[in-house]
A protein has these predicted regions:
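Non-catalytic alpha-helical coupling and interface elements of nucleotide-dependent molecular machines
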Residues: 156, 479, 582, 765-768
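Asp-box/BNR beta-propeller loop motif
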Residues: 553-557, 716-717
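Short beta-strand motif preference
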Residues: 257, 444-446, 525, 548-550, ...
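Acidic glycine-/aspartate-rich tracts in secreted/extracellular proteins
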Residues: 108, 554, 768-772
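Extracellular glycan-associated modules
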Residues: 588-786
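Formylglycine-dependent sulfatase
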Residues: 1-543, 547, 556-575, 589, ...
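Charge-dense polyanion-binding interfaces
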Residues: 574-592
Length: 786
């Protein structure tokens, strides 16, 4: 007879002679004395804290108001004033590695995530996902009875596995979360995001919607800063809705919520009211503003007395030397970033208010942090549209200034220039992707009204802390242990160091005194008060590159290189770095980027070697990395349809209103809109599509340079053609839709999804050859999207 494996009752001949047993699984209150394993029906203890981790993207050390900037972040500032503010917190220099380390309590390399999750290399340090021998915080807490929710950016699964076809084992629900709402890739448009709910793709809600969280919208009125949709608002609505659902039915069950905003990663987009708020605020330029922020940091005590402001990074020009148009453009790009962060802070405020309204705030450990330093992907001038750069179009400030009023809104995809990124990383040098302090030294605030000594609220913590230390700290606070075996797999040891002791006393010693860093061949090691760091040039001999040495206790901003003065100390730290590299699975060092993206398509495509992609609707939208890679390649697209004279709509769409390709039937004609950054090449067939079965073909051919051509055919007969002045190598960060237009409309000739109203039997895309330079352009684009 089959019985539950843990049945501890008694079975007699009848129910009157038997004793039932209900195995409800572990409960987090077991650790607090409220329940024990032998008495699962005892009353729960309310002392198990909730856990909420809020992660911001590409936010530099100085950019919160409480860390020195003049950007309005009153809600984060209030959390710091009522909690603890960490001044020596470090992440990895990149998105996916930080997230992997945060969620596992282990080094990113050890769990297979040395870089972004877009590729795997065949080595254990780069799997494209978190290894299964490293249980996530969600898996550990879920097994201990917590409800677990993931909202926002994931970027911890291989991108080609993020379509509706799966596999789903490395999506959030496959790694311990009960619910997920957000996006799987490295970035998304804030007004027209690629969204996933649990394990399926969904369209963004209408700007007019009901709001379960209690923030406006109860009567169906518009929600948003200017009456429109914005992803950050939606994410907070969803997080609060999940929490309300859980605590309403199971008030005895604590929750873990991981809220990872798309903000403040490019594109920098905010509601119009926030953009207007910052008009003119940064006209003084980055030199004056950076100095002011630095002086405010000294006054606030978030950098040690005597810290120097690092010199300008190479490529950052003095503001006063810039031409007028370049200054105007750069100032407006910084305004958009500030508006984006301000708006994000308001959403964090809504989250805090919602937790309070639900009666959950006081017993919630709330952690707000950034994943790496401010972004360098905007280049020296900043960009109006990142994809232009990746297509070899170097837009000058004089050209970009013509669209200055689009910055920060739905018609732009902007990132700010190096000067503002270094300002955001004040007082440090370098940026995201670098192992100097500008790339890894980021803000973190922790609030826990019930758990922190009231005397400690509003105080700073200057001890060195690393992102891998967060998970073991939270485990200690909630009273759980990371398992030695999970789902039958022996687990890697948790190598992060709990800093729970530091939360209750400012003078407690640091628990992490030895920390390595590595990114793309750049290396660093912090050992107590000392740091050795090497900035790697791709392709250079690792052994020939010079290391720098800094005494962080006296030189937090890495201004005084002691490598020549103390060669023995430097040699000691460099040797120790190699020891730590071996211990944490860092090796082999690998500075490849574009080669890996090419290998993904050439060697591991799930499609046949002839590169034929066949889609049969209805289908969910496909993310860019799972779509047919038509950028920079000649291809033939064939749509087989059955239509009446009245039928029309989109057959195929990829990209957005900023750049993309759309093929559709309108007013009886087959239409191509090839949108190269708002320069539209439109071909309308010279004959109507027959009202019957028909084969509709788009043939795109890349030329020798940056141009190409396109031709339409109906049932094999040419029906129109045109030259394409710019043949897009990297089309968009947004993927493809079959039978309708996803996200923002690629073409201005239709609105919304414009679904095809006839019968679309299939869309077949045949790639022709491999275009040189595409892998490099794709790699640059993906590295910017991390």
């Amino acid at each position: 007879m089959s019985r539950p494996s843990r049945f501890e009752g008694r079975i007699g001949r009848t129910v009157a002679e038997s004793e039932p047993y209900f195995d409800e699984g572990p409960h987090p209150d077991d650790a607090f004395g409220g329940r024990d394993s032998a008495a699962n029906d005892s009353a729960p203890n309310d002392s198990a804290p909730n856990v909420v981790v809020v992660l911001l993207d590409d936010t530099g050390y100085a950019q919160f108001g409480c860390y020195g900037s003049d950007i309005d972040t009153p809600n984060i500032d209030a959390l710091a004033a009522g909690g603890l503010q960490f001044t020596n917190f470090h992440a990895t220099p990149l998105c996916s590695p930080t997230r992997a380390s945060l969620l596992t309590g282990r080094s990113a390399h050890a769990v297979g995530m040395r870089a972004i999750s877009n590729f795997r290399t065949g080595f254990p340090n780069m799997l494209g996902h978190i290894s299964n021998d490293a249980a996530t915080m969600a898996e550990v807490l879920s097994d201990d009875g917590y409800a677990t929710f993931c909202v926002g950016k994931w970027h911890l699964a291989r991108m080609e596995q993020c379509s509706a076809a799966g596999p789903f084992d490395q999506w959030p629900l496959g790694r311990g979360f009960d619910r997920f709402y957000g996006f799987l890739e490295g970035e998304t448009d804030q007004f027209h995001p690629d969204l996933v709910c649990d394990n399926h793709h969904v369209e963004a809600p209408s700007p007019v919607r009901s709001d379960r969280s209690g923030h406006g919208g109860q009567d169906g009125s518009p929600v948003g800063g200017d009456g429109g949709y914005h992803l950050s608002e939606d994410l907070v609505d969803q997080a609060l809705g999940m929490i309300a659902d859980s605590v309403g039915v199971r008030p005895d069950r604590p929750f873990f919520t991981y809220l990872a905003f798309g903000a403040t990663h490019a594109p920098h987009q905010a509601p119009e009211a926030y953009l207007e708020k910052y008009r003119g605020r940064y006209d003084e330029g980055w030199d004056v503003v950076r100095r002011r922020w630095f002086e405010r940091q000294l006054a606030l005590g978030v950098i040690p007395e005597g810290t120097e402001l690092a010199p300008r990074n190479p490529g950052v020009e003095p503001w006063e030397d810039l031409p007028e148009n370049q200054r105007r453009l750069a100032a407006r790009l910084q305004e958009a970033f500030a508006a984006f962060l301000d708006h994000s802070d308001d959403q964090i405020g809504r989250l805090v208010e919602g937790l309070d309204r639900l009666g959950q705030l006081d017993n919630t450990v709330l952690c707000v942090l950034a994943d790496n330093g401010a972004s360098q992907e905007g280049g020296p001038y900043g960009v109006m549209h990142e994809m232009k750069f990746f297509n070899g179009i170097l837009e000058t400030p004089d050209e970009a200034i013509e669209r200055i009023d689009d910055i920060g809104g739905p018609h732009s995809h902007t990132n700010y220039p190096w000067g503002w990124a270094q300002c955001g990383n004040s007082p440090f040098k370098w940026y995201k992707q670098n192992t100097h302090e500008g790339g890894v030294h980021v803000p973190m605030v922790i609030s826990w009204p019930d758990g922190l000594d009231p005397a400690q609220r509003g105080t700073r913590r200057d001890q060195f802390v690393n992102v891998a230390d967060i998970a073991p700290t939270l485990y200690e606070l909630v009273g759980v242990e990371a398992p030695g075996t999970y789902r039958g797999i022996e687990q890697l040891p948790v190598t992060g160091n709990s800093f729970a002791s530091v939360l209750q006393a400012a003078d407690e010693p640091a628990t992490n005194t030895l920390q390595y860093f590595e990114m793309g061949g750049s290396r660093a090691l912090v050992a107590g008060e000392w740091k050795a760091v090497c900035k790697h040039t791709p392709g250079a001999d690792y052994d020939a590159e010079a290391w720098e040495l800094y005494h962080l206790a006296e030189d937090r901003s890495e201004c005084d290189d002691l490598a020549e003065a103390q060669p023995d100390k430097l040699a000691e730290l460099v040797a120790l770095w190699w020891v730590e590299a071996d211990r944490h699975g860092v090796l082999p060092l690998d500075d490849r980027t574009f080669e890996l993206f090419g290998a993904r398509f050439r060697d591991r495509s799930p499609h046949p070697v002839d590169r034929r992609y066949r889609y049969r609707p209805p289908m969910s939208p496909m993310p860019a990395q799972a779509s047919a890679p038509i950028g920079g390649r000649s291809f033939t697209l064939t749509a087989r349809v059955t239509r009446s004279a009245a039928d029309g709509g989109v057959l195929f769409s990829t990209g957005t209103e900023n750049s993309g390709i759309a093929l559709f039937v309108q007013d009886g004609r087959l239409v191509l809109d090839y949108n190269a950054f708002d320069d539209h090449t439109v071909i309308e067939s010279d004959v109507e599509v027959p009202a019957r079965d028909a084969e509709l073909v788009l043939r795109c051919t890349r030329g020798d340079g940056m141009s190409g051509s396109a031709e339409l055919l109906i049932d094999g007969v040419p029906a129109g053609s045109a030259k394409l002045p710019l043949y897009l190598r990297v089309i968009s960060s947004v993927g493809s839709s079959i039978g309708y237009g996803g996200g923002s409309a690629v073409s201005s000739r239709y609105q919304g999804a414009f679904p095809f109203s006839g019968t679309l039997h299939e869309v077949e895309i045949q790639l022709h050859g491999h275009a040189p330079g595409v892998d490099r352009a794709t790699a640059r684009a993906e590295m910017a999207r991390q």
